[in-house]
């Protein structure tokens, strides 16, 4: 677009925008005023409707007072005017008063008489039921003074009612109050239409809630105005009924006449303002075109014609327009004269220089003082894979990374100050490749000796440098592999040495992450899990990533598994891998990956992997070969570690078995001693009383014979209890039921059912926890343990006035702790461990054999749990234990 067109377009656009802004502002301001007028109009209409409604109620109140304060009405209510109904309560009377019903209540608040007519049909109809069953304290009939009265709206199931109630007095408006006179009109559709005609709007009135629901409320709402459509507004307002409750809804449809007329006026004014603005803008544009833009266009077209000529010799610009533009044309003509002479000299020099530049095998370039390329040769085009047209005028930031460009600018600054540069330059291109150049840069000077640019020659020595770097990397990798192999041979701590080996190898190959995965087979499916990992400080570790545990090879990594199972490395860029593999590699930030399989005894044990999370890297064959050797060393280390672990485990199991045998022998000795001692006591008792029995039989002493037999029977029963408890203890751990998974709460309820009789007889309150966890146990044994604990709590409850037992659970770390707590007699801390001993009793004279807690402990320990006591003498006992959960 030419300058002329740009100026015209810009100026015209600004004028148009200003016209639109003025029109919009005017429209917005007037629309706000129009909305206020429309709202005021709606308020006026609704207020008019309410005024007419109030006038209707006022006329009704006057009728009520005229009839209520009348001797005939008073005599009728007190039963002294039998002609009142015939003379006064007929259809033409009600029609003349414009009322639909009259209702009379006596001074006791009881309904005395009611009459209602349908004026359209002239027939008598029932009075509104809502007014025939008023409570005696209803404000309509409950009066505290002769002046009392209520006028308003009442909600009836059949519709709204206009009602006025007043006291019944004599014709002089004096008491006493003889009753209540209620007169009213139905606020039906016809009456609502009459109000609508008076106010000039469509009107609807209805109850907001069923009769009686709104009594007691005090809320009031203001007028709510909403738009139904573009032509109608809906105004709603809640009106208080005769009781002061907002139960009457008034809804009015108001035509938007003001809005229609106002919008038309606004449209006309906006169009007028817009057209006036356009006319003014057109005059401004015409002035610019004639005085400035047309002369400027003539000069511009002449310059363009000269530029398009092959050499532009002999062509000049006409001097037209104002003085400033004519002077500009003359200056341009002088410049053209100098330019023709300079071009001739430059053409010959350019031809010579171009021959040298185009045939050189090194990069040749020239930069201006701002380090912009003004000349590049074909070698630079080939290296950067860009045509010269894309390179000229650009700085080094376009071709190199920001860091490289900054270093080049620093060297260029020295050259521009007059100091030549000779040396190597390491560069990173924007495409991500690394290059090394041997560069020579010298300053370019003009005829006055001023530096006008930089001329440089650069030779690409990247291949030479990379070859040297690769040799150094291979030496470092071989050294790391040798050190890793040595460490794997001489160290036994396989877990720590593997981490050290991963660090050695990872640093040697300049990886960001090195790791080892181990395979395992579950239900015939081969899974892989990460076991070891080393990472650089800035790279996020993945050793705790649950996604990398028990990860199946199939189907997402089938190709990967097929490659490494053949002993081949898996290498590549993550972006080029299948989508199924990228799904879990990309979230780890991996860019390039190398996987080397680890075989143990000719079986794919797992693999060692190396990640580069910062660059797209292509692993060399030399690196892969060395890492394959290292993977073999790691596999051998795992074989040796497993062999050592098997030996240590076998030795440990042997020592454990020896310890178990020794412990069982010691336990057996204690058991035999205790059983022989406790069983001998009943036998001695039996033997002694058998002697007494012989003597008593000889003496034929019947009473003593009974005593002797009772003591012998008691000793036999004691021996039977001891034998049963001993047998039960011996079965724990030997007679085992299959473990079952279920709620621990079910086991608790089963144990409580066995002890329920004793609990009820002792009046013991039992509290149970909620949300019981699931356990996998021998249900019968655990139920037996709980029953013993409940029996102990009952037995040692003492004489507590409010005995209680609590059975519950709580999580503690990775364990689930169950407990049975009572508020019994408790025990000293020095008894906490003793009570689990065989046949041990705190009170030797108490019931039982002292085997119960020993059985409980044995049951818990057989399940792999532990049991302990928390107690204080006089403050109850809590037995706690753990059990395995699924």
Curated annotation (Swiss-Prot):
SMART domains: GAF, HAMP, HATPase_c, HisKA. Its EC number is 2.7.13.3. The chain crosses the membrane at residues 7-27, 270-290. GO terms for cellular component: plasma membrane. It catalyses: ATP + protein L-histidine = ADP + protein N-phospho-L-histidine. Residues 674-886 form the Histidine kinase domain. SUPFAM superfamilies: ATPase domain of HSP90 chaperone/DNA topoisomerase II/histidine kinase (SSF55874), GAF domain-like (SSF55781), Homodimeric domain of signal transducing histidine kinase (SSF47384), PYP-like sensor domain (PAS domain) (SSF55785). It is found in: Cell membrane. Residues 421-473 form the PAC domain. The keyword 4Fe-4S does not apply. Disulfide bonds: none annotated. Residues 349-419 form the PAS domain. PANTHER family: BACTERIOPHYTOCHROME, TWO-COMPONENT HISTIDINE KINASE. This is Methanogenesis regulatory histidine kinase FilI.
């Amino acid at each position: 677009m030419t300058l002329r067109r740009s100026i015209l377009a810009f100026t015209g656009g600004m004028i148009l925008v200003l016209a639109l802004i003025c029109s919009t502002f005017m429209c917005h301001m007037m629309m706000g005023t129009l909305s206020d007028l429309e709202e005021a109009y709606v308020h006026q209409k609704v207020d008019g409707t309410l005024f007419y409604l109030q006038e209707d109620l006022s006329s009704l109140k006057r009728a009520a007072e005229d009839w209520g304060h009348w001797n005939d009405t008073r005599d009728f209510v007190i039963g002294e005017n039998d002609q009142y109904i015939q003379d006064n309560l007929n259809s033409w009377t009600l029609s003349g008063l414009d009322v639909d019903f009259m209702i009379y209540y006596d001074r006791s608040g009881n309904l005395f008489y009611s009459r209602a007519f349908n004026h359209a049909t002239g027939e008598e109809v029932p009075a509104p039921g809502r007014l025939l069953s008023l409570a005696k304290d209803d404000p309509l009939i409950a009066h505290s003074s002769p002046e009392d009265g209520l006028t308003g709206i009442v909600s009836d199931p059949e519709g709204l009612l206009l009602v006025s109630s007043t006291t019944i007095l004599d014709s002089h408006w004096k008491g006493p109050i003889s009753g209540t006179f209620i007169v009213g009109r139905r606020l039906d559709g016809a009456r609502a239409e009459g109000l609508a005609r008076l106010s000039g709007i469509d009107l609807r009135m209805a109850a907001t809630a069923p009769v009686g629901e709104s009594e007691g409320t005090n809320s009031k709402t203001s007028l709510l105005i909403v738009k139904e459509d573009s032509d109608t507004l809906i105004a709603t307002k809640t009106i208080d009924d005769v009781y002061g409750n907002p139960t009457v809804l008034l809804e009015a449809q108001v035509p938007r006449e003001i809005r229609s007329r106002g919008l038309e006026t606004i449209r006309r004014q906006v169009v007028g303002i817009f057209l006036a603005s356009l006319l003014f803008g057109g005059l401004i544009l015409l002035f610019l075109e004639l005085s400035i833009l047309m002369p400027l266009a003539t000069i511009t077209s002449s310059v363009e014609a000269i530029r398009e000529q092959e050499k532009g010799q002999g062509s000049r610009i006409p001097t037209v327009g104002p003085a400033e533009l004519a002077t500009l044309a003359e200056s341009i003509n002088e410049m053209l004269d100098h330019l023709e002479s300079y071009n001739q000299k430059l053409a010959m020099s350019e031809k010579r220089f171009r021959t040298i530049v185009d045939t050189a095998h090194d990069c040749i370039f020239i930069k201006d003082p701002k380090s912009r390329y003004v000349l590049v040769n074909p070698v630079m085009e080939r290296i950067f894979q860009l045509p010269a047209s894309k390179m000229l005028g650009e700085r080094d930031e376009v071709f190199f990374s920001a860091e490289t460009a900054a270093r080049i600018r620093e060297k260029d600054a020295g050259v521009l100050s007059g100091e030549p540069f000779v040396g190597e330059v390491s560069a990173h291109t924007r495409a991500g490749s690394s290059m090394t150049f041997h560069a020579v840069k010298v300053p370019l000077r003009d005829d006055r000796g001023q530096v006008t640019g930089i001329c440089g020659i650069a030779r690409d020595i990247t291949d030479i440098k990379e070859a040297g770097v690769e040799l150094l990397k291979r030496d470092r990798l071989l050294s790391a592999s040798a050190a890793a192999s040595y460490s794997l041979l001489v160290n036994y701590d396989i877990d720590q040495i593997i981490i050290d080996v991963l660090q050695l190898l990872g640093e040697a190959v300049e990886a960001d992450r090195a790791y080892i995965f181990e395979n395992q087979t579950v239900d015939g499916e081969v899974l892989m899990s990460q076991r070891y990992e080393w990472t650089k400080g800035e790279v996020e570790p993945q050793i705790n990533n649950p996604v990398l545990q028990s990860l199946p090879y199939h189907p997402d990594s089938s190709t990967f598994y097929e490659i490494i199972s053949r002993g081949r490395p898996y290498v590549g860029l993550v972006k080029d891998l299948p989508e199924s593999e990228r799904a879990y590699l990309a979230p780890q930030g991996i860019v390039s990956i190398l996987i080397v399989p680890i075989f143990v005894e000719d079986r794919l044990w797992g693999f060692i992997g190396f990640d580069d999370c910062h660059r797209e890297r292509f692993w060399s064959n030399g690196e892969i070969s060395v890492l394959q050797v290292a993977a073999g060393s790691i596999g051998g280390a795992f074989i040796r570690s497993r062999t050592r672990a098997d030996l240590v485990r076998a030795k440990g199991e042997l020592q454990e078995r020896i310890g178990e045998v020794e412990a069982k022998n010691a336990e057996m000795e204690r058991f035999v001693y205790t059983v022989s001692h406790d069983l001998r006591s009943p036998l001695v008792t039996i033997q002694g009383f058998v002697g007494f029995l012989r003597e008593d039989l000889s003496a034929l002493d019947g009473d003593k014979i009974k005593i002797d037999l009772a003591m012998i029977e008691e000793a036999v029963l004691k021996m039977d209890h001891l034998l049963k408890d001993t047998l039960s203890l011996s079965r724990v751990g030997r007679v085992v039921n299959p473990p079952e998974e279920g709620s621990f709460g079910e086991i608790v309820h089963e144990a409580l059912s066995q002890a329920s009789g004793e609990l009820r007889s002792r009046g013991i309150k039992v509290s149970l926890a909620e949300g019981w966890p699931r356990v996998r146990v021998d249900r019968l044994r655990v139920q037996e343990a709980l029953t013993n604990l409940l029996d102990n709590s009952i037995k040692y409850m003492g004489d507590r006035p409010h005995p209680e037992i609590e059975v519950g659970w709580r999580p503690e770390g990775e364990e689930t702790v169950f407990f049975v707590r009572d508020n019994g007699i408790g025990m000293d801390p020095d008894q906490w461990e003793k009570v689990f001993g065989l046949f041990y009793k705190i009170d030797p004279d108490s019931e039982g054999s002292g085997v119960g807690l020993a059985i409980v402990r044995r049951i818990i320990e057989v399940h792999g749990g532990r049991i302990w006591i928390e107690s204080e003498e006089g403050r109850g006992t809590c037995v706690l234990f753990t059990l395995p959960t699924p």
